């Protein structure tokens, strides 16, 4: 077929490429709409699974890319993004551990690095115009490479459905294994997998068993609990069941241990950055165990005011990460605050895994502020309970004065 090539001045584009239907169609579309430009496919390996990477280079080249760069980011992703975020206590809207959100800044950073390496003058992503990811990616691009043009095909082209994309590729004799019958939209990395679409678009529908792919149904999980030990240094998991592991290996080990117990499933309706609500089902087995372990150590080592400050840091971090503001001064400051608080977050936790639950049942720390001698409900010789009387009188002084003033007003 005869295709008119538009003149836009773009010479070389680095595309965030997954090998899926969308990005497979984007490659020829870019050539047709951006000066027959050179397309460099870039894929970030953030632990989505080896099966997702098999044949990826061949597929990209067959679609029209001149190169395909697959960059292994797994260890960096866990060490530099997941661990600091978990240590901060960040959890979006009280439930979501930010698995997708945390992956976007490292992917964007690596994409920019590839663009610099190959001398590209534009970046491209396959995010839709309805979702959060377009904002996350482009926010990171703005912070890291404000000089590079950003192309977002879903905001430009007229295609609206999988059927449109399949027809587009067929017209150009580009083969794809994708079909029009895909039910769910999924996004996976080392930390979690998300599921959207299909029956989940109606919040009155219970997720079918076919939604979940990583964890066992808690109803079918073992009837006997499993206990896992985690050792923590400065807010980082360093050992699992006594074995020293790298951050990535620790996460993979905990995923393998916790998933058969159905740990880490959530079904939420969240507030998207772009204003609408969306429903998603998430599976985060290992991350849920890590989160529980760190919070358990914090209960031992953080005093009341420090714990209050950590909660404020966590709330702000959750929104910054969700909103794609990783590369901002505020995020840097909050990470520094979290790092400071984590200096005393050291110790060992035993987490009980049973029927979808991860519960910290044992914890100890060399920095523990808990004293059995002071906290005991039995007879003790170290705490004079009479001392509490003066504290209570001072603590409640403002309330006492307010009440006295109110009585004076009534009596006049």
Swiss-Prot record:
It is found in: Cytoplasm. Signal peptide: none annotated. It catalyses: L-citrulline + L-aspartate + ATP = 2-(N(omega)-L-arginino)succinate + AMP + diphosphate + H(+). L-citrulline binds at residues 96, 101, 132, 136, 185, 194, 270, 282. Keywords: Amino-acid biosynthesis, Arginine biosynthesis, ATP-binding, Cytoplasm, Ligase, Nucleotide-binding. The keyword Ligase applies. InterPro entries: Arginosuc_syn_C, Arginosuc_syn_N, Arginosuc_synth, Arginosuc_synth_CS, Arginosuc_synth_type_1_subfam, AS_cat/multimer_dom_body, Rossmann-like_a/b/a_fold. L-aspartate binds at residues 128, 132-133. It comes from the Bacteria. GO terms for biological process: argininosuccinate metabolic process; L-arginine biosynthetic process; urea cycle. Pfam families: Arginosuc_syn_C (PF20979), Arginosuc_synth (PF00764). One of its GO terms (cellular component) is cytoplasm. One of its GO terms (molecular function) is ATP binding. Its main location: cytoplasm. Gene3D superfamilies: Argininosuccinate synthetase, chain A, domain 2, HUPs, Single helix bin. Transmembrane segments: none annotated. Its EC number is 6.3.4.5. Belongs to the argininosuccinate synthase family. Type 1 subfamily. PANTHER family: ARGININOSUCCINATE SYNTHASE. Homotetramer. This is Argininosuccinate synthase. The gene is argG.
